[in-house]
Amino acid sequence: MSRIILFGGHGHVARLATPLLVQAGHTVTSIIRNPDQVAALVELGAEPVVADLEKLTIEGFGGLIDGHDTIAWAAGAGSGSPSRAWAIDRDAAVYSVQAALIGDVRRYLMVSWSGSRIDHRIAQTDDFFPYSQAKAIADSVIRDSGLDYTIVAPGRLTNDPASGGVERA
């Protein structure tokens, strides 16, 4: 089974995925920023590690991913803060790809969004621009990396029951 490092471990997607991964026999190391979230992740079956993605270097990411065979990126700042979107959705994601290439990790799963492409047509004046541009850049780096990758590009995320409908691009 895989040894997965899951960035953004306390986010909604990660909290739904973690028990499924653990039940399937995978080991999940869950990277979180807030130490108050450790107990909740232990309860889900993850091995939590507290780290601030905005402060990690490529070497810092390398230390975290060492011993894992898969990176799952579910971290994201969203559109609330432009500086955090650039720092997490672009810089930290790209650093994790670079660390994977230096280390032994060859599989990468990115949770992105359905409009993630360089020609996304989001106006630079739109509050969503930094997030959309950061995601587009990170996804492009992943595609060009040579890693065995999957980019999951959902539209709207909801708490509705799973429909089972997934389209492959």
Segments predicted by a language model, with ranges:
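Cofactor-binding loop segments of dinucleotide-utilizing enzymes, especially the Rossmann-like FAD-
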Residues: 9, 33, 113
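NAD(P)H-binding glycine-rich loop region in Rossmannoid oxidoreductase-like domains
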Residues: 30-95, 99-102
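Conserved dinucleotide-binding and phosphotransfer motif residues
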Residues: 24, 44, 145
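Structural motif
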Residues: 3, 69-70, 107
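N-terminal Rossmann NAD(P)H-binding glycine-rich loop of SDR-like oxidoreductase domains
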Residues: 3-26
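Conserved beta-strand positions in the Rossmann-like core of class I SAM-dependent methyltransferases
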Residues: 5, 29, 49, 150
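Glycine-/Pro-rich loop/turn segments that contact NAD(P) or position catalytic residues
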Residues: 77-169
